[in-house]
Amino acid sequence: MSTWSSMLADLKKRAEEAKRQAKKGYDVTKNGLQYGVSQAKLQALAAGKAVQKYGNKLVLVIPKEYDGSVGNGFFDLVKAAEELGIQVKYVNRNELEVAHKSLGTADQFLGLTERGLTLFAPQLDQFLQKHSKISNVVGSSTGDAVSKLAKSQTIISGIQSVLGTVLAGINLNEAIISGGSELELAEAGVSLASELVSNIAKGTTTIDAFTTQIQNFGKLVENAKGLGGVGRQLQNISGSALSKTGLGLDIISSLLSGVTASFALANKNASTSTKVAAGFELSNQVIGGITKAVSSYILAQRLAAGLSTTGPAAALIASSISLAISPLAFLRVADNFNRSKEIGEFAERFKKLGYDGDKLLSEFYHEAGTIDASITTISTALSAIAAGTAAASAGALVGAPITLLVTGITGLISGILEFSKQPMLDHVASKIGNKIDEWEKKYGKNYFENGYDARHKAFLEDSFSLLSSFNKQYETERAVLITQQRWDEYIGELAGITGKGDKLSSGKAYVDYFQEGKLLEKKPDDFSKVVFDPTKGEIDISNSQTSTLLKFVTPLLTPGTESRERTQTGKYEYITKLVVKGKDKWVVNGVKDKGAVYDYTNLIQHAHISSSVARGEEYREVRLVSHLGNGNDKVFLAAGSAEIHAGEGHDVVYYDKTDTGLLVIDGTKATEQGRYSVTRELSGATKILREVIKNQKSAVGKREETLEYRDYELTQSGNSNLKAHDELHSVEEIIGSNQRDEFKGSKFRDIFHGADGDDLLNGNDGDDILYGDKGNDELRGDNGNDQLYGGEGNDKLLGGNGNNYLSGGDGNDELQVLGNGFNVLRGGKGDDKLYGSSGSDLLDGGEGNDYLEGGDGSDFYVYRSTSGNHTIYDQGKSSDLDKLYLSDFSFDRLLVEKVDDNLVLRSNESSHNNGVLTIKDWFKEGNKYNHKIEQIVDKNGRKLTAENLGTYFKNAPKADNLLNYATKEDQNESNLSSLKTELSKIITNAGNFGVAKQGNTGINTAALNNEVNKIISSANTFATSQLGGSGMGTLPSTNVNSMMLGNLARAA
């Protein structure tokens, strides 16, 4: 046990000694490092104080004993420095060695000394001898002295420019005085400039190799989690697109003032291997290549320093480097080239149409992509270096200073590259702008307007089938079509990039003529006075000699003029403000003596002004004033206020082709026919075409251009009080909107159409024609001989006094008339209710289960096989002569029976729908009203009277005597002729149905006969095959009160 105790005590003693030694070593190391850092800072400060006076100068320092004759063009460099105003200083070697030792510039040709920024002649001369690419620029000591001097000046002025870029934003004097981080940055920048000049001599990448590596890079990241889409896009970069850059020194000269031209990837003669930044090579696998190269370098440095190079450490370094390589940076490069390719393909068509602006835009993105590609590649390598160094120094005591140094230098390089990119991109944009200027000078035309012209030509080509069909669609011989070429993003982007937004307009309007499906290239003689001036808001087609369509095919911006001014709002920010001097109306002079169609639905009549919480959206309205001619015209209105002077002819105004708001059409104050005031509610869900000011942003590196322009959108108005007011003159017919409209007729003849929506139409006085159309409408004819058509929906038709024609249409409708005139009530489809007046009414329920009530007067009821279960309630006087016409029934196929007080007729034919006709209270006694139908006539003209039926049912038990009470005529042509005469009389008077319209006089015979034949068809008259023969036997009665009408009507 004592032995183990001794061993343990000895081990403990040794551990404590090792700990003391380690602490002692740490303290020594720490103190040494602190002392070294302190001494370096003191030396830097000492040197800095000595060079305050010269810190902003560049001095060429030459040892007095240095023999420059062995150099390559050395004396030309010295002379060039003198010509450029660079001080040439000959010093003793001892003085130079002191500077080298103090600032570590012994191996550099550029450094900081007590004299300022110093070019060391021997090192520079050795550099030129070493790198033939530079020395060949300078040349030997023989040759054209002037040429050599110029080339020498290029080298030294290039170095000056590099320094200016490196030290941009650093006050060198203050940096030297403070001795802080900015001095370190300056020293690192000077060192960097030396390295950059050295890299001129090194091989650079070629475009083709770079393309391949980017594509391979895409393959690698495609399988990485979350980066699949990025990888696939990178693989789509076109090699040919990159290889055909044609990028010359005129474009890349601003990259570090031309000194670092090797970074621009433009040397076609260089090796196909890719060399980036400080010589790190991108292999075919970009990530792997950079990671491997950087990792190997850093691991070697760790090994030399005696630090760990184990597997975990190497993995940490490699993973850190991989993370530092950003796929998004390469994706941005890919996007530039892809956009260039996309625009380039688009440009081909318009180049053939006379506009090459899209090609110029494509060129910009191509060259910008090349610039971005070079800088991105370099920055990627630098990021990998910094990340790897940071990982390698993790956990090491000496790591932090190394990390700060490397990070600072690589950050500085990246900053220089990023700073240099802007002038390069501006140079490209300026070059393209010069091409635009040259074109305008040559052709004397606005370049961007020419772009709109090309877009319009393409529109005509693409839309020819549609445009040429308008003549037929609107039933006119000629079409005058106005289109607006709206703001174009490519044209706007080109104007922004070149800084020429003030020369651009928000679009351009065009007028084209089509006739017989053909585009008229030139204006025909009779259109020689056509006026279309969108700046004044004037359109004139009054001299057209044919029926004409005036149509705004696309939304047309409000009339007026535009002006623009480009101003700078920030260091890199510019805005081109738009000022619109708008007109307050459009004035259209229409065709004088021919019918025309005016489609204004795409006319923009509201220009957005402002928005506020209290007042909502506010607008400037542009009124439409349209003077029509003497023909029959049609006008389709937009959402703004209008003044229509229709002139002579039958003119129709339409509100249903677009969203025109909730209408109130008022003719109650009219002193002449065709005069109406229209108020339209444009709030709520009403969508209007409104003109708005938008902006497009485009960027040239850091420079951002904002261009304002006019555009339009179809949207809700956003103003609860927004209204439009129309004044209509000499308008014969109005078609409402697709909302709930209210029509108030005049004391003259009104023709109203409700269109869609649940509408209220009131004709007031006059012989009116009202159409409910779709929706659940209410139509009131009031006084006059009116025609009311319910259309679709469950409608209510009130004919009022007069001779009225009411047609319910589809839906469950209610039809009602007043007075003692002649009225036609037709239910149509659906379960309808028809109420006659005290006059002579025609009641035709149509399809469905209908209720028909004729009232007083001699009424005419119609029932057919397509009718459903109808109920007739005729509450008339005993002197009335009511008739029921069975339109397509024969008595032989009808069964009659008494059910309570009702007379019931039903069909027994399988082809019929087995509907039941009930004549209510037929048998009711002790009532002052007569509920019987005096005559029932079948399709063949055979007639049964109420008296016949009464006698039959009174003596029903004696069935063999029934035929003695029937009429003696099996068929009688005079019965049908009499029916036709009665129907013609009712229909002719009802709503003036048979009167010819549109100013003609007399009877419209065709319309009248058509209505009569709808009820009494000649096809149903006197067909002898229907009177007996096979299948015409009687049915046995199962009830003493039931009998076939055919047996009752047939006399022996």
Curated annotation (Swiss-Prot):
Major subcellular location class: secreted
GO molecular-function term, one example from the UniProt record: toxin activity
Intervals holding Hemolysin-type calcium-binding repeats: 744-761, 762-779, 780-797, 798-815, 826-843, 844-861
Database matches in InterPro entries: Hemolysin-typ_Ca-bd_CS (IPR018511), Hemolysn_Ca-bd (IPR001343), RTX_C (IPR013550), RTX_pore_form (IPR018504), RTX_toxin/Mannuronan_C5-epim (IPR050557), RTX_toxin_determinant-A (IPR003995), Serralysin-like_metalloprot_C (IPR011049)
Membrane topology, as annotated: Multi-pass membrane protein
Keywords in alphabetical order: Calcium, Cytolysis, Host cell membrane, Host membrane, Lipoprotein, Membrane, Palmitate, Repeat, Secreted, Toxin, Transmembrane, Transmembrane helix, Virulence
Subcellular location: Secreted; Host cell membrane
Matching PANTHER family: S-LAYER PROTEIN (PTHR38340:SF1)
Family per similarity comment: Belongs to the RTX prokaryotic toxin (TC 1.C.11) family.
Function, as annotated: Does not have hemolytic activity but shows a strong cytotoxicity towards alveolar macrophages and neutrophils.
Domain notes: The Gly-rich region is probably involved in binding calcium, which is required for target cell-binding or cytolytic activity. The three transmembrane domains are believed to be involved in pore formation by the cytotoxin.
GO biological process: killing of cells of another organism
Post-translational modifications: Palmitoylated by ApxIIIC. The toxin only becomes active when modified.
Transmembrane spans: 248-265, 275-334, 372-418
Domain of life of the organism encoding this protein: Bacteria
Pfam family, one: RTX
Name under which the protein is recorded: RTX-III toxin determinant A from serotype 8
Leader peptide range in chain numbering: none
Cellular-component GO terms for this entry: extracellular region; host cell plasma membrane; membrane
